[in-house]
């Protein structure tokens, strides 16, 4: 039976206005829209009155529901029948954890009530198309129609393909029907294999073969034999990449054989809880570094949010599934798309060349895709710290004559670093009889054929197959699985994981054969033991679907009870679906139909399939000299600053959490004005050291339209000039990931790919001492479609994205582009040696040209000398600022440095040649460094010692004020106010934020950037930052116990425990499942802290599901009430813990006036480094800090204080319960965005009880308790940041 329960309003006023504006633009007479959530409860038994009231209360969250009955025509948008949304699985979990076992499943839809004039059927179709994502949702016209969401179907049997009866044609037909993308020789191979076996193949076997042997999984082109211009080539592409490892194996611990590569890290204190006692402590050991970079291009073109989200999720799983289990740590992301054509902000170079119907626009991708990638990282709890963004779409005269080149098939890059224990780097041995386990969520009928689909050019496959190949994301489930993996590796020698892989392309059909085959075993499996939420799925759908957030593991049979215990505690679902066999054979039994859908020798599936030979021709690009007529420097500056590749990226940065883990030493945002211009990302290796890890990206794809090899060399060079800004030491410490994107088969591109791989793998990297131990290829970067009567193609440039990773010696010595105005000198190190080439530059692009000669690595020895020289200067502390030259050239390098320093520049380019345009806009490799004027001679001496004397040019100095002036030989070349340039640079991000978020907030942020008087972040402390008020109490030897409380989806508990640990507490890991099962109680604890993250993925309101699992469970409710009423206890709730505790008002004495915390005014997750003031309040944690103003990490989507009315707000204020407020950079309490990131009235962001014993706050003090983890800080701070004081206050209060 199904119950229907109304929910809260689903759209804010500005979202409704945006929808109405879209309808009006489409000439649809829609006058009014009202939208509200509707909940559907599938029940296995009727609810009594109390249970019904409980369910209603559970589903009451968010803004208050309108009292009137909605008017207009109903359009009900729900998940597609046959799928289960992530919302559903998490909401159902909450219901069960609250004791409502009669609920089979909860699901949610949005009921739109449309008031409109007379619309035709076709116009109604237009309306419904605007309201739902056809990839994931459907539209009903009556609430009762939602019954279809819970319809169950009977299982369907396996289907046989009549090869023996119909011969080869049966395989050809199956290839088309199932979208297998099999090549002719593979069809021959299968015909031969099954004829020898004397039986017909089943559809599931063919599908499994296609996935396991797709280009996506087997990398056939990179392993192919090559004939170029009739000449046999000596090496495959992959062998040339491996040459870098053979030449420089130094510091690499694992390459080419696992889900990620591993290099040596530093010996540090890894901080985690003991399995038996739950007590957190440091464990001194090597924290080796793993690295991986993936792409998820095809799904992102079809459906950007889930495409980018599952791209990030899959890469995170790769990291976790390295060795015998590892810990993902920090991420990077990148996008290449065609021109944005922002409505009302179209640029002169942005022509519309059309696109296929089934893929979305570049604007859609950049609106939804980054949000999907960021949301996954945020909810999983991984900071996203680095990235790139390129737009390109043009008709150019390249290698193949005049043709369309651009990114209709986008690049969506997802990568990152993690850490792994030394004894877990290599996978273990799978013994015969080992249990084969799937860890993670259930099988769902989604993401079928992703491997094969992504191996085809967009437009070649059936639209329905395209849709089927997109997956859904549930990061909170992946977090639970990762917690299990963490518990396993933390057991050291007792780790129950023998072998682990992630489930990605091809689902279990690829992952399980890979697992057993890599372990030298076969496997026998039972289909019906696979967790599945859809009983009507066929064997093919169960075995081959790409449901996300799953891992496959081999666990020793005697370790299964331990593994079961860990999974139950973390509430991570798992299933034992088979066991390892001696015989190298794969069998899958189906007990429902009592048959064998799969019965194959492993070597048929993974054996010697036909090897590819690429017989290709070289084409040379002609190029045309840059036509300069009509180009002025003033116009060029404005155009280049508007090019998205160059322009400010704030709209891509602040949506991503950049502080979670408490180990982020350098994020994108630089300096007191928080400008997104960092050269590289840096994390600390642990919470107790200054060792670290660095990441940087290099990418120069448009250059490949003129010179394939130069483009690849520049990508390596740019990655190197970016990562050089931190203290690494020997260049051999740097390891690269190479991600290759090409349109294989397009004239000239294959030979160009070979040329580029050779340039990097055989020549440049070995010469520099660089290794490429990991990478990925995507070989179908072309889109075909019909535009009227014309057949069109959009082919991407050959695109190499290099991600550089390195161990860092001391994270405190990372140099940023932030200029200082003390007596200084700016020096350009020009590795272009005066070539100043303008081919394929940003300048050429904004004037719709390609040019002829591009930049290149001009001298490999000088590039190596450059890196070594910068490292020497970093170590000697000679650099005040550093920024590499890249897209936009020297002009943009200097401008970005001025933006970061909020200062002026007097630049002198006299020594850079007479061609001023080329001097300012060439994109040759190099960097601008700022040094003290007194150090100039010593710095130039170091550069000369490294062979760079002829590359160094004096280019002026930074000055106070707002003028950005470039001169040469006393003549003014360009002059403008820095503020004007800053506003131009910001206009793209402003327009994107206006489209995507609350336009009022976007306008306020843009306005703030034009205020030259803004003093930036600053600090005023009312206490001595270096005084340890806890020291006398720590000296007694007593360590009070603090319960570090987490619920599924919480992700900030480790850094919280570390902060309390440093203040003299014993921090104990307490999961809500420990309390609900009675494994742990709160009676032994002196303090309790509820941590940040996304409990239940913020389903049923942020923190509300967590609170209700306490309130609706009598024993646990009593436990909390007793704790809060016990004298001499302290409690802190941060972010998600703050939201949760605000819903426990009925249990917490003196909290009756506390507000609720609801959706930010911007309607967006906000990650900021915000200034707050400590106000006079009873809070015991903030004693002695009143009046202090200091920055703090903020990361939340629902942090806006909501009060009942003005009287409620006045009472909260008059009782003095407000503990922290947002202030602007002038020190004034503010409600203006982004200084107040959520729009809370009176800037309120923390409140306390009347006794001061319980304090809740939205910002994250635990992420910035170390100075080094602050995005910006005064130079005189030591190890401890000012927020360490609240943890020491807690220790002091407990005596």
Curated annotation (Swiss-Prot):
ATP binds at residues 307-318, 678, 886. It is found in: Cytoplasm. Residues 1042-1295 form the Glutamine amidotransferase type-1 domain. In the N-terminal section; belongs to the FGAMS family. GO terms for molecular function: ATP binding; metal ion binding; phosphoribosylformylglycinamidine synthase activity. The active site is at residues 1135, 1260, 1262. It comes from the Bacteria. The keyword Iron does not apply. PROSITE patterns: GATASE_TYPE_1. HAMAP family: PurL_1. It catalyses: N(2)-formyl-N(1)-(5-phospho-beta-D-ribosyl)glycinamide + L-glutamine + ATP + H2O = 2-formamido-N(1)-(5-O-phospho-beta-D-ribosyl)acetamidine + L-glutamate + ADP + phosphate + H(+). GO terms for cellular component: cytoplasm. Pathway: Purine metabolism; IMP biosynthesis via de novo pathway; 5-amino-1-(5-phospho-D-ribosyl)imidazole from N(2)-formyl-N(1)-(5-phospho-D-ribosyl)glycinamide: step 1/2. Phosphoribosylformylglycinamidine synthase involved in the purines biosynthetic pathway. Catalyzes the ATP-dependent conversion of formylglycinamide ribonucleotide (FGAR) and glutamine to yield formylglycinamidine ribonucleotide (FGAM) and glutamate. Its EC number is 6.3.5.3. One of its GO terms (biological process) is 'de novo' IMP biosynthetic process. The keyword ATP-binding applies. This is Phosphoribosylformylglycinamidine synthase. InterPro entries: Class_I_gatase-like, FGAR-AT_N, FGAR-AT_PurM_N-like, PurL_large, PurL_linker, PurM-like_C_dom, PurM-like_C_sf, PurM-like_N_sf. PANTHER family: PHOSPHORIBOSYLFORMYLGLYCINAMIDINE SYNTHASE. Pfam families: AIRS_C, FGAR-AT_linker, FGAR-AT_N, FGAR-AT_PurM_N-like, GATase_5. Mg(2+) binds at residues 718, 722, 884. It comes from Shigella sonnei (strain Ss046). Keywords: ATP-binding, Cytoplasm, Glutamine amidotransferase, Ligase, Magnesium, Metal-binding, Nucleotide-binding, Purine biosynthesis.
